[in-house]
């Protein structure tokens, strides 16, 4: 959750946009995207597993956001139906394998984002983005540290979730 707001900003997600994602999962990113694109936008969400997609759909229905999302059940190796997305968030195990398909789905100047748990994935994805002509590529990690709010003992809390993943962003250029 600490990463989602930053992802939306870095990918320029705004009302009225056509945004894609692959790797729907429980739908937490889908919910954030659907909220950000507003009533006039559309999220197209690809997932490979029916039970996972069903869970995400239920979560969006509970929040009244399901009408903003087109759910598609498909192995993304086959590519995507769309070719004019403003942005694409890829949350799959080997994102570097799907960069050509993502590139084909994005409009020129379209934003790309992904989350990667390991350095190995970062390296492979960077190489793939370079190979397929993405620009303005950035990699970062967000660290959130909470503090005890006792005025007499202001200090960091005893525990902290440090690493959720590396975030990577880029833009499709011609």
Residue ranges and their predicted role:
Residues 170-174:
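C-terminal lobe and adjacent flexible extensions of AdoMet/dcAdoMet transferase-like proteins
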Residues 9-14, 36, 80:
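Glycine-rich helix-loop-beta junction characteristic of Rossmann-like nucleotide cofactor-binding loops
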Residues 26-39:
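Conserved SAM-binding loop of SAM-dependent methyltransferases across substrates and taxa
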Residues 40-44:
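Short beta-strand element of Class I
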Residues 46-95:
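S-adenosyl-L-methionine
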Residues 16-25:
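Conserved class I S-adenosyl-L-methionine
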Residues 96-166:
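C-terminal substrate-binding/active-site "lid" region of AdoMet-derived donor-dependent transferases
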Residues 37-38, 65, 106-110:
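Helix-to-beta-strand junctions that scaffold the AdoMet/dcAdoMet cofactor pocket
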């Amino acid at each position: 959750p600490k990463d989602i707001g930053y992802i939306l900003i870095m990918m320029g997600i705004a009302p009225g946009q056509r945004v894609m994602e692959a790797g729907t999962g429980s739908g937490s990113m889908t919910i954030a995207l659907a909220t950000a694109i507003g009533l006039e936008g559309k999220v197209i969400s690809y997932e490979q597993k029916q039970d996972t997609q069903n869970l995400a759909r239920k979560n969006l229905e509970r929040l009244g956001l399901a009408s903003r999302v087109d759910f598609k059940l498909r192995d993304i190796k086959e590519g995507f139906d769309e070719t004019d997305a403003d942005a694409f968030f890829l949350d799959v195990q080997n994102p570097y394998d799907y960069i050509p398909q993502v590139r084909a789905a994005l409009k020129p100047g379209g934003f790309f984002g992904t989350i990667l748990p390991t350095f190995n994935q970062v390296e492979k994805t960077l190489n793939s983005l370079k190979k397929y002509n993405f620009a303005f590529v950035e990699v970062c990690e967000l660290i959130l540290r909470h503090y005890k709010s006792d005025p007499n003992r202001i200090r960091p809390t005893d525990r902290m979730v440090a690493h959720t993943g590396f975030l990577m962003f880029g833009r499709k250029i011609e």
